[in-house]
Amino acid sequence: YAIENLQCYAPSLHDVCVGVTLNDHSIFDMAEYLRQYSQAIFPLFVWSIWHYRNGSYGRFSILDFLKSIELGKFSLASAENILQHLRKKVARKVDTLRHENPGAKESYLAVKEDVKRLGVTPDTTYLYIQGHHLFDKVVSPMMEKVCSALIHQRQTEIAHQSMHSTQRSNELSCYANSLSDVTTMLKKNYGYQTSTPFNRILKDVEEYLGEE
């Protein structure tokens, strides 16, 4: 959808956290979280495309879609509960759309197969929603919490390993000055360049330019 989606490419996010915190421990499976998030929103994503293709965009707009998939405040401890709440919210909206479009089953399934043909899968839906929403509402809040926990973990390690208070103070100060912020590091993230979606884009551009 946009560069923000690629910057949020799930397999690259651990390295972004390392760049922010200088701590390479893995404390939360961000790729799995985004996979489950994608699976949860996929049915509504298909409905969004269905409405657009059928000229009824006003009845379920992108803004309606984004409102339906909002997560609320993220925390590491409640990540599973957040996803479960999302699944229930999506299910309610899907039921509403089915009731509003009782004859749409076959055309909905056709759209579903077509978006899969185009490369969107239930596991990777996050890459194809509005980029700003993904960046600002889903990935950044998640990474802020992960990085805060990693920073606290590293600060605790430094404190325990220090021989005296002066060393502890100096090393903690040095560590603090070495930290980066999540938004800056995400915007510098080029880990998507080896991804299948990015290479598909390159291939499409090459084919397009070759036709001219």
How does the language model describe each region?
Residues 1-212:
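Acidic, divalent-metal-binding catalytic cores of TOPRIM
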